[in-house]
Amino acid sequence: MHNSLTLKRQGYLLTNKYIHYICADKINAMIKTNLFLLLFVLLAGTSCNRQQHFISDDTFRAEVENDFRAKQAALPDGNLFSVFNQKMASDEKEALTFLYAYMPIGDITDYDGQLYLDNIRSSFRARVEMPWGDSIPEDIFRHFVLPVRVNNENLDESRMIFYEELKDRVKGLSLYDAVLEVNHWCHEKVIYTPSDARTSSPLASVKTAYGRCGEESTFTVAALRSVGIPARQVYTPRWAHTDDNHAWVEAWVNGKWYFLGACEPEPVLNLGWFNGPAYRGMLMHTKVFGKYNGPEEVMDVTDGYTEI
């Protein structure tokens, strides 16, 4: 009887310990799960806060908003700003505000706002999906990736179309090599041919498969920007050795600007047939969309662009 009772008591104690261990394991698992969920929420909240503003500088963001309101006041008729009634993320709205604040009035009246919103979303997608996206500083992305217009070309949906064709071609490359590869792709699409003074749109250049230097450089800048590579068109109105002009492209790579001949691929950047004339050029300039405060010498500031 004693042994039987003892065994029962021991069994009871063992059972209690087993239950205790199970309960403790469940409690620990619940604590770990809750801690994981809390950490996930905190990280997600931090990420949301980090992506909340397209323009992180409060002063500059306020200046852009004031310029946007002035543009709205100048165009009170019609539904020219109806795209802002759509549901969009806060960073998308700030980017759209930036574009509308400084784009020419003709671009507001001639094109539907959905075109600009689609371009913004494609730019943000490229920044996320391209391996160099996180390395592009905010101001460089704002002035040299986001803008749709390059020169005086007609605007089109080239950014979205070019991205789908180029994304897999450049994904495994460094930013430097991606610039070279995009220029090879541009050479496959467009060759140099003199044309009239009107600048064709990027898609029109692909359709005709030719263009003068101003059209080739407009096309190449659009292609580079489509995959999140900062790019700008550079223009000289007159060479030192001849009464002629030229336009080419500069691309931003890891903190430096490199030049390249548009649709004229070379094995490295900072190499082109115009190297010599460019070093002796009297004037080379580019028009940067919006109010730009970079290290370059500023030649002029207008309501829509900064000439450097």
Regions found by a protein language model. Give the residues of each.
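N-terminal amphipathic/hydrophobic targeting modules at extreme N-termini
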Residues: 4-6, 10-11
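Positively charged n-region of N-terminal signal peptides that target proteins for export
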Residues: 26-35
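Sec-dependent N-terminal signal peptides
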Residues: 34-43
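C-terminal motif of bacterial Sec signal peptides marking the signal peptidase cleavage site
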Residues: 45-47
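Bacterial Sec signal peptide processing site at the extreme N-terminus
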Residues: 49-58
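Secondary-structure boundary elements
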Residues: 63-208, 243-244, 296
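Hydrophobic/aromatic-rich core segments of domains that either
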Residues: 166-169, 173, 178-184, 193-203, ...
